Amino acid sequence: YVQERSAVYVEALKRGTSFYLVDRVIPMLPRELSNGICSLNEGCDRLALSCIMTINKKGEVIDHKIAETVIKTNRRMTYTNVKKILADKDAAVIEEYKELVPMFEKMAELAAILRKKRMKRGSIDFDFPETKVVLDEDGHPIDIKPYDRNVATKLIEDFMLIANETVAEDYFWQEIPFVYRTHDKPDSEKIAKLSTFINNFGYTLHIGADEVHPKELQKLLMKVDGTDEESLISRLTLRSMKQARYTTACTGHFGLAANYYCHFTSPIRRYPDLQIHRIIKENIRGRMNDNRREHYESI
């Protein structure tokens, strides 16, 4: 729906992303697309680009296929209701969605396996509390409440991460021009300063050859979890790291301890995802010739 060089394409490129304000959303794409024909609305057939994966009990992707598909959403679910099913064991909600409960339970089982595998390799999870602002009828802020990051939101995060990793690795080995989401190793000087600071609280970092493994930072965050100094040390750890970037070279993602990573899952609200979808579709349709490769390399 967003053709290259069209007016919608040009405007999406200018915006780059959707903006989520306190009381409204300014979408990257026109609302007719973002809330309509591109949105997985209940009971509607929608064109999609899917990463279909076979994952074993160890959390390893043993087979996958990236394909143009048609998705029809049978039921519209909310994070709240999925949480009530999986965590709260709410009898009324379980009864309402009883035909879907076994699938949610399998999804939760798989998400836990994927999360455990990421943590084992050293992926860092900054679980900062998010907030939402409550407004009165006149649009004035009257309260700030914590945003609940629960089993349902984490489940979706786990699935998005594995899809992004799988797509990035696939296109890296195909040697097709691509946009990766990369996160470089932190500067040794900043890590040294962090190490010196946390020593005051009795914590240490093992730094080898002037660099630190993400697993060391993960261990630190686990040690400070629930302590009085957790907020301070967690934020200083985050500031010690570099910002993630979009690059055409696949140099890995330090924070996720991943060799391959991209942003594939949100083409409605992020321009890099939209560009990736365009590249993938051209490749699937057999149109990725030398001219198109040169075109993508040039931009």
Where are each of the predicted segments found?
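Conserved, carboxylate-rich catalytic/transport cores that coordinate ions
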Residues: 1-299
